[in-house]
Swiss-Prot record:
HAMAP family: UPF0597. Belongs to the UPF0597 family. One of its GO terms (molecular function) is L-cysteine desulfhydrase activity. This is UPF0597 protein CLI_2075. Pfam families: SDH_alpha. PANTHER family: UPF0597 PROTEIN YHAM. GO terms for biological process: L-cysteine catabolic process to pyruvate.
Length: 434
């Protein structure tokens, strides 16, 4: 473990999970664009006459095809326009809270009149947005980097009006701190942390269960959840916990990707990852009638493992973080919930990695529900297999000598192996933009 005391590590991990586990309305990439524009507008007198957006390729890929909340339209240009019209930066990840038909009509008019431009930019942090707002008198440049609401700099008429202190220092500390831990360390912290500190975990469980219920009722996104439920009711799918996790996780993603206004608790800064971590663990907990406290700890463990994996793969990457990183978090939480020790927890993770490594990210959109549903059911199955001593052997394929080695291999694959693949995927998925 780190040179810090166990108590300090526990508090730092808790702080990190709280920071990366917050409610959001809508996909967080369009949210980041709208939030950046809305923040810049605060520094401007009068109306916004022109918005020039520059975004990282990952923001572009993950934001172009997902429906904006309370609308039936997609696009980062629309997101930017709405941020300038009705976005409130004080709302953070709820920046789309005030969107209505009148504001949407105004945003569409801005797009029609070419008020908003959108271009990708190279060699930036995966989470990067630069919004240049021009009015009658003022020009404001707002820069977001490293997090979906992390404003780094505001420049007003050529002068710096705001600059964040110690740029990236906290992120680097968090990254170093997480990489010093083992899965065993995280498991021990999960078991020892005071349950009184985990109230926010229960909030996320209830929030995402409600989102899944709404997703089953409303015709949003791909409507995969309700379609799977229909198949189950017709006797074509079972009623086991893996299938229920598949249905509910798909339904939550349908709602989120389809522009639903229901808030969703994120994990690692992503709503889909929040759904994929929380719902499968909750389904298994309800199936085995686990105590509330054990459910809370299992979900906390899932969030922590998801964040641990993402410190190697990156916040946004060429692989599907929702299916892989969040799925790994879910299976770890389930294995622990079922009474698994380190061998079984690690085994469940290895089973998931042997199964789903290579699932690429081709952008946020309605069909993300398919990937999430696959990951949710496989997370349940992988944990039960590990509990029955069915575990992929070490040093086979991507599987290394330990679970930590394997996660490091995944990170190498993402950053070194899939870097070019991400560019190719961007050219395929975003050819009409770039």
């Amino acid at each position: 473990m780190s040179r810090l005391s166990k108590e300090e590590i526990s508090e730092r991990l808790l702080e990190l999970i709280k920071d990366e586990t917050k409610p959001a309305i809508g996909c967080t990439e369009p949210v980041a664009v709208a939030f950046t524009v809305a923040t810049g507008k605060k520094y401007m007198a009068g109306e916004v006459l022109k918005i020039d957006l520059k975004v990282s390729k990952n923001i572009l890929k993950n934001g172009k095809s997902v429906t904006i909340p309370n609308t039936e339209v997609c696009g980062l240009d629309i997101a930017g326009a709405l941020g300038g019209i009705c976005g409130d930066p004080e709302e953070g990840l709820f920046v789309f809270k005030n969107v209505n038909k009148d504001y949407l009509d105004k945003a569409r008019e801005m797009i029609k009149n070419k008020v908003v431009t959108l271009n990708p930019i190279e060699n930036t942090d995966p989470v990067f947005v630069e919004a240049t707002l021009k009015g009658e008198k003022d020009e404001v440049i707002a820069i977001l980097e490293g997090g979906h609401t992390n404003i780094e700099r505001i420049i007003v008429n050529g002068k710096i009006a705001f600059e964040k202190d110690n740029k990236n220092e906290k992120d680097n500390k968090d990254c170093d701190f997480m990489k010093e831990l083992s899965l065993k360390d995280i498991r021990e912290i999960t078991e020892d942390i005071s349950i009184e500190k985990l109230g926010f975990i229960m909030d996320g469980i209830e929030m995402n269960k409600e989102a899944a219920k709404e997703g089953l009722k409303r015709q949003k996104g791909l409507t995969l959840g309700s379609s799977l439920l229909k198949l189950q009711q017709e006797g074509k799918l079972g009623k086991d916990s893996a299938t229920i996790a598949r249905i509910l996780t798909a339904a939550g993603s349908d709602l989120r990707m389809g522009g639903g206004m229901c808030p969703i608790m994120t994990s690692g800064g992503s709503g889909n990852q929040g759904l994929c971590v929380i719902l499968p663990i909750t389904v298994v907990a309800e199936d085995i009638k686990a105590p509330k406290e054990k459910l809370q700890r299992a979900v906390f463990f899932g969030h922590a493992v998801n964040n641990f994996v993402k410190k190697y793969t990156g916040k946004l990457s060429a692989i599907c973080g929702c299916a892989i990183a969040a799925g790994i978090g879910a299976t770890a939480g389930i294995a622990w919930l079922l009474g698994g020790k380190d061998k079984e927890i690690n085994g469940a993770i290895l089973n998931m990695l042997a199964n789903l490594t290579g699932m690429v990210c081709d952008g946020a959109k309605g069909s993300c529900a398919i990937k999430l549903s696959t990951s949710a059911s496989e997370a349940v199955i992988s944990a039960y297999l590990a509990l029955n001593d069915i575990i992929v052997p070490n040093n086979t394929g991507i599987i290394g000598n330990t679970v930590e080695d394997t996660i490091n291999n995944l990170g190498m694959l993402c950053k070194d192996g899939f870097y070019k693949a991400d560019d190719v995927m961007l050219s395929i998925a975003c050819k009409e933009v770039i």
